[in-house]
Curated annotation (Swiss-Prot):
E.C. designation(s): 1.-.-.-
Originating organism: Escherichia coli (strain K12)
Protein's UniProt name: Uncharacterized oxidoreductase YghA
InterPro entries reported for this sequence: NAD(P)-bd_dom_sf, Sc_DH/Rdtase_CS, SDR_fam
Keywords noted in UniProt: Acetylation, Oxidoreductase
UniProt lineage: Bacteria, Pseudomonadati, Pseudomonadota, Gammaproteobacteria, Enterobacterales
Domain of life: Bacteria
List of residues that carry N6-acetyllysine: 39
Positions that bind substrate: 186
Positions of NADP(+) binding: 53-77
Active site: 199
GO-annotated molecular function: alcohol dehydrogenase (NADP+) activity; oxidoreductase activity, acting on the CH-OH group of donors, NAD or NADP as acceptor
Region of interest (Disordered), residue spans: 1-32
Gene: yghA
Family note: Belongs to the short-chain dehydrogenases/reductases (SDR) family.
Length: 294
């Protein structure tokens, strides 16, 4: 009997109820709760005894990656904002149920001191580090440039771009040959929305920084690749990432006619972390429901 499923209906296809949470949002309080593979992702030992740091690992795409890494046999450290402790504790429980070590490292990635120390704390707690999945990001929709403040513009770049620089600069000397860095850009790097000027600009910066870094560290045996999600149902969207009028139809403009779920990105983060992608570096992997990159 075939286990094939229709991808257009495999996950939630209805309208999303309007809902607003303070930034950064708590996934457990969303309706519907995003699917991060808690009940569905099955590992096969592809990352046995690897050591992973996942930023934004409490919810959304980062949570899905962290769960998948643990089920593939890796020990996992996650970073998150202190207000996201509820979601983070849930991820910790799931990782430990896999028989793997879970390390919680709360803090603000826009703080250079914290971001730089995060790498060393994860390395120490895990007894090494060979996977970095950099997922955490800031997205706040502002329809009119007149309302976009310098404070928000700077904060978005600090979390999305400067933290990427701080984290990777600290990590490169610590990473062994065979290590993998996975950054998170967006379809917004290619098709910027008018209400996401600062966010889209950071995602283009991530793309080029990652490609350049990949070429620089290739001779060290370290790979760097980029995941570019399309519209994915996460706490980012309901905590200011979209205006409320866009929530009900979120993702329905794609050829798949629905938003993606974080669980649908987890296999990409696993593949790029694994030895199966040994000849893959400086590449962008879109997960956009049929929307094209470029």
């Amino acid at each position: 009997m075939s286990h094939l499923k229709d991808p257009t209906t495999q996950y939630y296809t209805g309208e999303y109820p309007k809902q607003k949470q303070p930034t950064p949002g708590i996934q457990a309080k969303m309706t519907p709760v995003p699917d991060c593979g808690e009940k569905t992702y099955v590992g096969s030992g592809r990352l046995k005894d690897r050591k992973a740091l996942v930023t934004g690992g409490d919810s959304g795409i980062g949570r899905a990656a962290a769960i998948a890494y643990a089920r593939e046999g890796a020990d996992v450290a996650i970073s998150y904002l202190p207000v996201e402790e509820e979601d983070a504790q849930d991820v910790k429980k799931i990782i430990e149920e896999c028989g793997r070590k879970a390390v919680l490292l709360p803090g603000d990635l826009s703080d250079e001191k914290f971001a730089r120390s995060l790498v060393h704390e994860a390395h120490k707690a895990l007894g090494g580090l060979d996977i970095m999945a950099l997922v955490a990001g800031k997205q706040v929709a502002i329809p009119d440039i007149a309302d976009l403040t310098s404070e928000q513009f700077q904060k978005t770049f600090a979390i999305n771009v400067f933290a990427l620089f701080w984290l990777t600069q600290e990590a490169i000397p610590l990473l062994p040959k065979g290590a993998s860095i996975i950054t998170t850009s967006s379809i917004q790097a290619y098709q910027p929305s008018p209400h996401l000027l600062d966010y889209a600009a950071t995602k283009a910066a991530i793309l080029n920084y990652s490609r350049g870094l990949a070429k620089q560290v290739a001779e060290k045996g370290i790979r760097v690749n980029i995941v570019a999600p399309g519209p994915i149902w996460t706490a980012l969207q309901i905590s200011g990432g979209q205006t409320q009028d866009k929530i009900p139809q979120f993702g329905q403009q794609t050829p798949m006619k629905r938003a993606g779920q974080p669980a649908e990105l987890a296999p990409v983060y696993v593949y790029l972390a694994s030895q199966e992608s040994s000849y893959v570096t400086a590449e962008v992997h879109g997960v956009c429901g049929g929307e094209h990159l470029g």
